[in-house]
């Protein structure tokens, strides 16, 4: 079926608050007919986000139906992932209008008696993107089985919602344009929506998070030389660090890309948690990975959406100078500095007979950022 999404983001359609909507608009705009947000009605996605062209923002379901959608997409990923109670009636009305429902919330809509009953009555389907498979095993370090043929790159970050998924998707597209055999391993509901497969690891029972990550990498590595794993959370996040560590331990990355926002000095919604200087954070991040596999941070991806061009270029130059690592904003600018670092790292692994560059560095005193 050719999906035609009407995206529900009422009161939340912004560069940071509507993550699922924004990714769908950026990477699959051909499937989006309109966005519902009465506070932005009359504008376009381009006006609100800086991309998305003429996709309209409308004030109601009735107005959105003019675009002939066949599905309603829940366009937000709020803290806790719960369905806003005020949205229930609109979703039920959308089902009455024969729209399938796509949701990435922790609230599993197909388990809700009212939604399930209405779906049966109207003949529509509910797609819960965060519903994990029920046969995930614990991690057993099996990613080591692909060490002789694939390089695993994990995005990590100083906070949530800072660009870990977007960075990997930008890298995926640009690397494929270069002819690389690269795969993106989605670990969250929005990545699953864009890519069409994956596991939302934050919905997995804690004991099996690493196992889910392991499973994703093994699947992605079947037809790829480089696996780009979507990171989640942050090692210093007071709410979500458990998912972050599960991904590190399960995906066993060979190297990491650090994602940061130059203007963000504290964890969002937790202002008491200050973000350390980037060089210090890199040392902490590498130390977190080291017990299972030394994995250096080899490049920095900045999110400069809230800076003008001069400020963004200045931030890139400053971080490059301070860390000694290739740095760019892979959305705003050319992602080539990060891609070049990944390709050089991948080549070096196999030039060393399969030994990781991280191991070589560790023997010589640690990663470049740690020496700085």
Predicted regions and their residues:
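Flexible, glycine/proline-enriched loop segments at strand-loop-helix junctions
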Residues: 102-106, 154-162, 199-204
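Walker A (P-loop) phosphate-binding motif
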Residues: 139-182
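ATP-dependent carboxylate-amine ligase catalytic core
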Residues: 2-4, 10-12, 16-18, 26-27, ...
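Phosphate-bearing ligand-interacting subdomains
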Residues: 56-97, 101-111
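Conserved catalytic-core segment of NTP-binding enzymes
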Residues: 107-109, 113-115, 128-129, 133-136, ...
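Extreme N-terminal, non-catalytic leader segments
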Residues: 90-152
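C-terminal lobe/tail of nucleotide-utilizing enzymes
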Residues: 5-8, 12-13, 45-62, 272-372
């Amino acid at each position: 079926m050719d999906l035609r999404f009407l995206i529900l983001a009422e009161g939340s359609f912004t560069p940071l608050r509507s993550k699922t909507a924004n990714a769908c608009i950026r990477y699959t705009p051909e499937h989006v007919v309109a966005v519902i947000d009465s506070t932005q009605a009359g504008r376009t996605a381009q006006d609100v986000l800086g991309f998305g062209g003429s996709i309209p923002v409308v004030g109601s379901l009735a107005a959105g139906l003019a675009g002939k959608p066949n599905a309603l997409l829940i366009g937000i990923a709020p803290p806790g992932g719960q369905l806003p109670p005020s949205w229930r009636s609109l979703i039920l009305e959308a089902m009455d209008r024969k729209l399938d429902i796509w949701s990435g919330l922790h609230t599993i809509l197909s388990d809700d008696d009212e939604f399930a009953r209405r779906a049966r009555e109207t003949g529509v389907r509910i797609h819960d993107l965060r519903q994990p498979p029920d046969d995930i095993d614990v991690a057993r370090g099996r990613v080591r089985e692909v060490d002789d043929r694939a390089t695993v790159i994990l995005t990590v970050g100083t906070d949530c919602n800072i660009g870990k998924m977007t960075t990997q998707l930008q890298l995926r597209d640009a690397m494929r344009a270069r002819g690389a055999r690269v795969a993106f391993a989605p670990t969250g509901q929005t990545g699953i929506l864009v890519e069409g497969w994956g596991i939302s690891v934050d919905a997995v029972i804690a004991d099996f998070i690493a196992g889910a990550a392991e499973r994703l990498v093994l699947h992605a590595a079947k037809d790829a030389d480089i696996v780009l794993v979507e990171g989640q959370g942050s090692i210093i996040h007071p709410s979500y660090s458990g998912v972050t560590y599960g991904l590190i331990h399960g995906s066993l990355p060979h190297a990491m890309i650090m994602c940061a926002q130059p203007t963000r000095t504290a964890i969002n919604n937790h202002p008491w948690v200050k973000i350390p200087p980037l060089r210090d954070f890199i040392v902490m991040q590498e130390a977190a990975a080291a017990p299972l596999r030394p994995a250096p941070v080899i490049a920095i991806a900045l999110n400069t959406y809230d800076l003008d061009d001069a400020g963004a270029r200045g931030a890139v130059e400053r971080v490059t100078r301070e860390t000694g690592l290739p740095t760019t904003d892979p959305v705003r600018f050319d992602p080539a500095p990060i891609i070049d670092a990944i390709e050089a790292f991948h080549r070096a692994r196999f030039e060393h007979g399969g030994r990781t560059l991280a191991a070589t560095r560790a023997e010589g005193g640690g990663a470049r950022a740690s020496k700085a």
